[in-house]
A protein has these predicted regions:
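Anionic-ligand binding patches
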Residues: 45-180
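N-terminal polybasic phosphate/anion-binding patch
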Residues: 2-74
Length: 180
């Protein structure tokens, strides 16, 4: 059985598990070796625009690749960055995923979760979404669990499910390179 080696630009178990789940689903004939590393985003702790959120995901993935040695034989470098923005229909949270595979890259985005205006205002004041959600819902470290997504959807969707789907969609160019 061939091994697929993946580095995830985060130590957050939600992000590492999402990568493990998505890649195992996409490559069922491979043994998965997936490890997380601390990777700086180079953007604010709470990105407030789509542009900075995308940049954070790319920065993390690039950092992972830069830290890798050729003898490590890594197949993919994957990173997520969660952010918020004020869209035409109101504030929402979402995540970007950046994937590096050899000399190619793919960037994708998750679905957007509408946020209450009051939560967005707290974020605009400099707070992080996870902390705001913990305070409002009396949870602890929700960002390493179901996240705001889980709380606001009654766990019908979670950070893991949302990140898994975003990664699977962003993998399309690698699954069908002849089409891209």
């Amino acid at each position: 059985m061939k091994t697929l080696n993946v580095v995830v630009g985060s130590m957050n178990p939600v992000k590492v598990n999402a990568v493990q789940k998505a890649m195992s689903q996409l490559y069922p004939e491979h043994k998965m070796h997936c490890r997380g590393i601390k990777a700086p985003s180079g953007v604010a702790d709470q990105p407030m625009t789509s542009k900075s959120t995308r940049e954070g995901a790319l920065n993390r993935a690039l950092f992972c690749k830069q830290q890798s040695k050729p003898e490590d034989r890594m197949d993919y470098f994957i990173a997520f960055e969660g952010g918020v923005d004020l869209f035409e229909d109101g504030p929402a949270t979402f995540a970007y995923v950046a994937i590096l595979h050899h000399e190619k890259q793919s960037v994708g985005c998750s679905a957007r979760l509408p946020l209450p205006r009051s939560i967005y205002n707290d974020l605009a004041d400099g707070k992080e979404l996870g902390h705001v959600m913990d305070q409002r819902f009396h949870t602890h470290n929700i960002k390493q669990q179901g996240g705001a997504i889980g709380l606001l959807t009654n766990n019908n969707a979670t950070r893991t499910s949302t990140y898994t789907e975003a990664l699977i969609l962003a993998m399309a160019p690698f699954l069908h390179p002849d089409q891209y």
